[in-house]
């Protein structure tokens, strides 16, 4: 499958499979992060889930999807190496670890950590990665501001930023996909507004 077709399918899944369950989750007081696990062979959805922190603060969108995936009967659950992992938002440190420990060799995401902070008013992904993992240089006692927050390609997995993938396409494919991303930006802006209105009222530690 060519890159444009892959991206189109991933946007389909966000719009048709993840966003509807996320809308219900946000209505209950959860954050707007969601995820899906697809078969690499035909890009069919195995599970699509959303954040469920009002039940357990560890049930971020990705972690909740992983939980549901491993609850499937073994004969209905594909091997993780045969799966594509899709997150609406760039995974936080918890979810990066969950993806790694679960054995997935990839993940794709639409919104970046910076988007989570700047567009959705949820700054904890960057804050925690910097506070917990960014060890200062012994010589200076500081951390370089240009230091990456994590290794986006490593021995366990390779990450894929969908917006950057679109930017690398030729114009004939790019314009339609950019328009679809704009629509998803609007959709998630509405979800964010709904979450922010009730934020802090459901007992989520880092709301």
Where are these regions (language model features)?
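Local cysteine-cluster metal-coordination motifs and their immediate loop/turn environment
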Residues: 86-105
């Amino acid at each position: 499958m060519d890159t444009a077709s892959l991206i189109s399918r991933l946007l389909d899944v966000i719009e048709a499979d993840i966003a509807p369950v996320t809308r219900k989750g946000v209505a209950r007081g959860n954050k707007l992060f969601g995820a899906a696990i697809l078969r690499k062979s035909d890009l069919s959805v195995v599970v699509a889930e959303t954040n469920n922190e009002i039940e357990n603060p560890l049930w971020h969108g990705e972690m909740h999807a992983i939980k549901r995936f491993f609850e499937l009967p073994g004969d209905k659950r594909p091997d993780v190496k045969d799966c594509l992992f899709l997150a609406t938002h760039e995974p936080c440190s918890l979810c990066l670890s969950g993806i790694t420990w679960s054995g997935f060799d990839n993940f794709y995401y639409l919104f970046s950590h910076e988007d989570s902070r700047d567009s959705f008013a949820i700054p904890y992904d960057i804050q925690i990665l910097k506070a917990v993992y960014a060890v200062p240089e012994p010589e200076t006692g500081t951390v370089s501001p240009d230091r990456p927050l994590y290794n986006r390609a490593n021995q366990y997995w390779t990450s894929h930023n969908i917006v950057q993938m679109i930017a690398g396409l030729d114009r004939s494919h790019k314009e339609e996909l950019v328009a679809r991303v704009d629509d998803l930006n609007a959709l998630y802006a509405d979800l964010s507004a709904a979450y922010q209105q009730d934020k802090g009222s459901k007992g989520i530690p880092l709301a």
